[in-house]
Structures are given as structure tokens and as C-alpha cells.
């Protein structure tokens, strides 16, 4: 009986070690796809978000289900700013799917990193426009910034940093 449990535990660890690089590569590919799509079309397809959420199954941890709560602040902002100039539903769903992979604390840290980059870039673009005396306002996509934050936190977690 004890030999069986040791065998299955060892097999589970070996299987997880095989799945981790697969998850990492697919996660990066999907994050790049989200970024490119959001920059070019100003929308994030549901299929990419479902793909990211499905990746959480490769290294499933029940506590990561709470990560979906990382979408709540984005949902609140989206509901408050419904004039078409706020964040969109794609950003809300992206935050939730990233939270499923990263967990609640990882998802929140990824959001902080992504939003910090977003705000600093927005300020930089605004200063550039004022310096060049340009009046047009181009919307800045949030998806690429969330993707960078998620990649940073993901590899911090893989590297052993507990968040």
C-alpha cells in the first residue's frame, strides 16, 4: 500500500516537471498573441483568454481558483467608465484568466506591474504629445502591459519566489 502511494506521488512529480515547460512556452505564446492582437485591433479575442485559463489545468492548484477575483477591480473600473474610453471587457476577462494561472496574489502582483507600466507609458506618451504639440489622442491598450506583468510574475513563481 505504501509503495503504491510513493510510486504515484513520484509519478505525479515527474509528470508535473514535464508539464511545466509546456505550460511556460504556451503561456508566453498566448501572452504575445494577446499583446499583438490588442495593439493592432484594440480587442482581445475570447479564444486567447480561454487558452490562458485552460493552461491553469496543466499545473492545477485549487487555491488558484481564487485568482479569478483579480478581475474584480477591472470590472469595477469598466462599470464606472462605460463611456467607451475606459477599459474593455477583454481586459477584465484577461485579468481573470491570468489570475487562474498565477493565483490570487500572483494575479494581483501582475496587475500592479502591468498597471504601473501602463500609467508610466501613458504619462510618457502624454509628455511626448505635448512636446510635439500633437492633439490627437490614441488609446493605449492595456493587454500588453498585463501580459508583461503576468510573464514577470509567472517566471518569478517558477523560479521559486513565493507570492
Regions inferred by a protein language model and the residue ranges of each:
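A membrane-topology feature that recognizes alpha-helical transmembrane segments
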Residues: 1-163
Amino acid at each position: 500500500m505504501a509503495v503504491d502511494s510513493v510510486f504515484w506521488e513520484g509519478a505525479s512529480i515527474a509528470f508535473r516537471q514535464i508539464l511545466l515547460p509546456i505550460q511556460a512556452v504556451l503561456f508566453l505564446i498566448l501572452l504575445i498573441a494577446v499583446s499583438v492582437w490588442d495593439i493592432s485591433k484594440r480587442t482581445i479575442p475570447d479564444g486567447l483568454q480561454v487558452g490562458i485559463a485552460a493552461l491553469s489545468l496543466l499545473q492545477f492548484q485549487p487555491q488558484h481558483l481564487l485568482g479569478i477575483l483579480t478581475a474584480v477591480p477591472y470590472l469595477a473600473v469598466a462599470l464606472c467608465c462605460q463611456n467607451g474610453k475606459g477599459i474593455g471587457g477583454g481586459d477584465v476577462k484577461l485579468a481573470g484568466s491570468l489570475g487562474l494561472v498565477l493565483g490570487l496574489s500572483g494575479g494581483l502582483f501582475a496587475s500592479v506591474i502591468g498597471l504601473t507600466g501602463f500609467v508610466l507609458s501613458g504619462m510618457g506618451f502624454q509628455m511626448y504629445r505635448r512636446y510635439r504639440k500633437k492633439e490627437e489622442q490614441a488609446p493605449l491598450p492595456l493587454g500588453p502591459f498585463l501580459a508583461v506583468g503576468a510573464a514577470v510574475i509567472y517566471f518569478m513563481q517558477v523560479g521559486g519566489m513565493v507570492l
